[in-house]
Structures are given as C-alpha cells and as structure tokens.
Amino acid sequence: MFIYDTKSKQKVPFEPLVQNKANIYVCGPTVYDDAHLGHARSAIAFDLLRRTLELSGYEVVLVRNFTDIDDKIINKAFKENKSIQELSSIYIESYTRDLNALNVKKPSLEPKASEYLDAMVRMIETLLEKNFAYQVSNGDIYLDTSKDKDYGSLSMHNSSVEFSRIGLVQEKRLEQDFVLWKSYKGDNDVGFDSPLGKGRPGWHIECSSMVFETLALANAPYQIDIHAGGADLLFPHHENEACQTRCAFGVELAKYWMHNGFVNINNEKMSKSLGNSFFIKDALKNYDGEILRNYLLGVHYRSVLNFNEEDLLVSKKRLDKIYRLKQRVLGTLGGINPNFKKEILECMQDDLNVSKALSVLESMLSSTNEKLDQNPKNKALKGEILANLKFIEELLGIGVKDPSAYFQLGVSESEKQEIENKIEERKRAKEQKDFLKADSIREELLNHKIALMDTPQGTIWEKLF
C-alpha cells in the first residue's frame, strides 16, 4: 500500500506503527452551520482510504471529531439565543444525516472537543512547565513557536518570511504564536473553570488532545499512523498541531499526513467566507447521495474538483452501467475477469488511484456485458459476478441499491402506481393489436422522463435525468 505523505512530499509505502493495524484521525467539521461539498469530499476521500486499507487486510480505527467549542459557534449561539451545546447538536445531527446519505461509513469514534477539556488543560500545563508556552496579561496562553526549530516543516511556511515581530503592547512574541487557552472575557463569551483559570481551549490544542485520548498506543502514546483532512487545514491548523506535540512530548504527531484537494465552484475555491458554499443537504434535494458520492470520488483525492452539474451527469453514466449489469446478472448470467478484484484493489493501494480503478471498472463492465450477450443462459459464474459487484460496493461505496430502486430515484409511490397503471394499459392495447395506442402511451411517459423497456420478464421502466 502506497500513500502520498504531505510532509515528505512523496508517495511512500504505508508502514503502520503496529503491523496490520492502522489508526487514522480525520479533522471533522466545526459545527456552526450545515456541511458543504468540501466537507463531503473530505469525508468520502478518507472513507475510501479506510475501505481500501480494510480490504487490504488492515484492522482500521478511524476517528473523526466534532469541533463544538469555537468562536463561530459562540457568536452564532448568542445571536440565536441558544447554548453552544444546543446549536452544535443541531449541526452534528445535520452532518450525520448528510454523510449517511453519501454512504460514508460511521467512524470508529466521533469525539466532541467539549468532552476532552481535562486532557487539553493537562497538555497546556505540560507546555507551560516545559517553557514552550507563555501567558499574557489578559490571561490568554500562547505557544512560543520560536522554540520549535521545526516549525513550518509540514506546510513549508517560512517563519522569517511569513511572519514578523509585533509590538510589545499586543504581548504576543511572534505573529505566528498561536493561542492555547482563551481566558473568559465576560458577557457574550463562554468559559469553563480549570486550573488555568476560567476560559476555553484554542482550536489547535483541541484536536491534538483528542488524537492522544482516542488513538493512544502502548508503544506510541503520542503518535498515530495517519492524520488527515482538507488542504485548507494544512496551515495553520495541522502545522500548529504538529508543533505543540513536538514541544509537549518530543515526537511527531503523525507518521503520515494526508490532505484532500479543494472543491471549486465556477473555478473559484468554495468557502463560506466567499458566500459560494454548496450545502450537501441542498445537493441532496436534486441528486441521490450515491450519485453525489460517485461524482466526488471520481477525481483523485489530491486534485482540485471543479464542481459542475454537467460533469456530475456524465459521471452518473458509470453508475448506470454498474446497475445495468447488476440488473442483467440478477436475471441472466455470464462471465467476468477473474482478476478484477485484485486489479482494482491494487489501483486503490497506489495512493487511492481512483482514476485507474474506475478504468478497470469500466473495462470489467464492458467485457462482462459482452459475455452476457454471447451466453445469456450461462449460470456457472453467477456467484463470481455478484461477488465482484459486491466488492465494488465495499471498496467504493457505490452500487449498493437494488437496480429498480436506483433507476426509479425521485419518483413518489403514487407516481409509481400511475406509471404501473399506464404500463398495464399499454399491455392491454398491445394484446388488442392497438399498437398506435401502445406507442402513444410510451411517448406520453417519455415526455414525463419515464422510459419503458420491454424484456423477456416483462416491461420495466426508469426515470431519466
């Protein structure tokens, strides 16, 4: 298994701290609003990593957190007259619903920052004791980055260029020094009683503490195999996580760092600050979650994905092929490449080379359909074909529905009954040799984007996009 390590900037063999086991920490959302397609892409990218590792024989523990203590949450909670717990729980539920719709496997653990305050305080106390942190007059505590000679080694931000000394009035020693603890400022603030005084943790210390508390190993209590997240988290978040871990415990936080690329809208980076966010829940109003998943995984995870609906509909054709084969196999049988599982898994073991994997998938779909055309009654390889289709489900998380359910997405039960009534009416017209009426019914349904197909088993239908 090979993965691209952001820190070394090269593709390297994956060699976990414990043989045949992999522990992964993925930075989750700050829960003050609904999740957008950028969140979806990150979740799907590392869901693919998890699935690939599991099918390669690794025992995987994947942790994805919720940041439920943050300035944005506090500000919105006060504006809406809610507690931060009330507000964050709304968006945790929303995020969970969205990812379920995208068939993202549930993480092994989903810690909330608010559940690990004691661990955060202990880590800050360690940094103060070792003289890597300092407190300013308003009670805030900062990490002294000048004492970490490796600061910037992950993101390649050069402190001498990117930052400068600032006025003594502001009390921070360097502009890049980051807050570990924010003291309670009174009205419209949130604080927790602690040995550090009343206050709350900074964003970066939250994640590091949750990493150690949820993924600690006996032989490496302060290091994990893979730390992952979106490219926007590389600096300052991941850089600062790595820094405070080196300072507190003298080790690198993660053996490997992985980052997924941005999602662009109209060739511009999607972000809430730019006002061009495309929420998952809104996308799900127009497209089934499996169609969105199939589209978002279709571009290599490290590349930028420029979202547009034309490409989404083109990528849907791949899903159509999977379901057409599944539909055929459930009724008729044929042969398939016996090396398919090995070939597609090897593609994914090469830094999640999904483009190559999808090429192998396309080849399998085409060749299998050809063999079904040649041997429509051959039952010998039914189990193998269905096993390979199941493997696609497990590896890529697509093709999981019953074919009829997939091809009838977006049609209500009452509409389905109307269509079935029309099909029955058309059947009677054909029996009475009234082919003009039968064709008229077909055209009427087609005008409503319902296509009919006559098969040996009877007439089936599907919704066109």
Curated annotation (Swiss-Prot):
Its cofactor is Zn(2+). Belongs to the class-I aminoacyl-tRNA synthetase family. Monomer. Keywords: Aminoacyl-tRNA synthetase, ATP-binding, Cytoplasm, Ligase, Metal-binding, Nucleotide-binding, Protein biosynthesis, Zinc. GO terms for molecular function: ATP binding; cysteine-tRNA ligase activity; zinc ion binding. A motif ('KMSKS' region) lies at residues 269-273. The keyword Electron transport does not apply. It comes from the Bacteria. It catalyses: tRNA(Cys) + L-cysteine + ATP = L-cysteinyl-tRNA(Cys) + AMP + diphosphate. One of its GO terms (cellular component) is cytosol. InterPro entries: Cys-tRNA-ligase, Cys-tRNA-synt_Ia_DALR, Cys-tRNA/MSH_ligase, Rossmann-like_a/b/a_fold, tRNA-synt_1_cat_dom, tRNAsynth_Ia_anticodon-bd. Transmembrane segments: none annotated. SUPFAM superfamilies: Anticodon-binding domain of a subclass of class I aminoacyl-tRNA synthetases, Nucleotidylyl transferase. The gene is cysS. It comes from Helicobacter pylori (strain P12). This is Cysteine--tRNA ligase. Its EC number is 6.1.1.16. Gene3D superfamilies: Cysteine-tRNA ligase, C-terminal anti-codon recognition domain, HUPs. It is found in: Cytoplasm. Zn(2+) binds at residues 27, 207, 237, 241. NCBIfam families: cysS. It holds the Pfam family tRNA-synt_1e. Binds 1 zinc ion per subunit. ATP binds at residue 272.
